[in-house]
Amino acid sequence: MNAKKWVLSLPVIVLILAALLAGFNYVTDPFGAFGDRFMQWFSYDETNNPRAAKISYLEQHHDEYDSYFLGCSSTSSLPTESFNEMLNAKFYNLIMYGADMKDCEKIANYLIDNYTVKNLVLNVYLDNGLTYDDESNKLTHSLHYKTDPDMSALSYYSRFLLADPRYGYQKLVNKSKDTLMPQSFDVFDEQTGAYDKRVRDVEPIGSTADYLNAYPVFTDYPNHEPLHLYKTEACMQSVAAIRKVCEENGVNLIVLTAPVYTDYYKNFYDDDITNFYESLAKVTDYW
């Protein structure tokens, strides 16, 4: 092949390879970005990206729910069955790794605009004063474009269609290893949205010494200078926006802040911690 033919052929080759890559990523859909039409393995997708995959799941199942938990990882500990009974509701848990309050605001708006929402339980965690509107990874922490007015459909679909094919390949490999019990690659319960704790709940705790030996993080918190909660004001602006949209649409909003270990407070300055909780109290009542 002479140089001229090679130059003319190169764009065609690139387009063919891009089409093959996009097709593979669409079929395997390791982040649940396209609704996982072929594998329907949302517990896996949500483990990779709960922000996108859970919205894809709700697009297909939203008629099964009328209430939602919203917040970062500690939100998963809220007992779905108890809240269902207490509020005569059908809850789905939209826990997201490292969710900041801007994520929560955008998703709350989407839920209320598109689905039936009777109750919204919002977990405002102390770390929400530390980060705000921060997409740390375009694949694993990306919102679904339908929940994010700042993201175009083109930007959303292109990032997942042209993603590294190793993500899709790994999904196929892990599918062959899948069992009835949760593993590290499928940690969510699809029907509730919460962490699937069937294995964790039967784990023998043993003595305090045994437990701390197995989970040394509880005795060895990171030793660093305290951090400032610089994003507290922005966080509270989003909480206020969520409260407002709930009031306007007759949604019962319950705000809580998940408890933390005493040693965890050492990560932050005392004045910042006080300001965070006092600022939240000025915006809304909370548990």
Please tell me what each predicted stretch does.
Residues 1-7:
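Cytosolic-side transmembrane helix boundary signature
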Residues 8-26:
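Hydrophobic membrane-insertion alpha-helices, especially the h-region
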Residues 27-51:
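Alpha-helical transmembrane signal-anchor/signal-peptide segments
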Residues 43-69:
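Short extracytoplasmic
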Residues 64, 69-156:
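Membrane-embedded segments
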Residues 93-98, 225-232, 265-268:
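Second-shell loop/turn segments in exported
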Residues 133, 137-249:
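Secreted/periplasmic serine-hydrolase-like ester/acetyl group-modifying domain
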Residues 234, 241-287:
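Extended hydrophobic/aromatic segments used for targeting, binding, or gating
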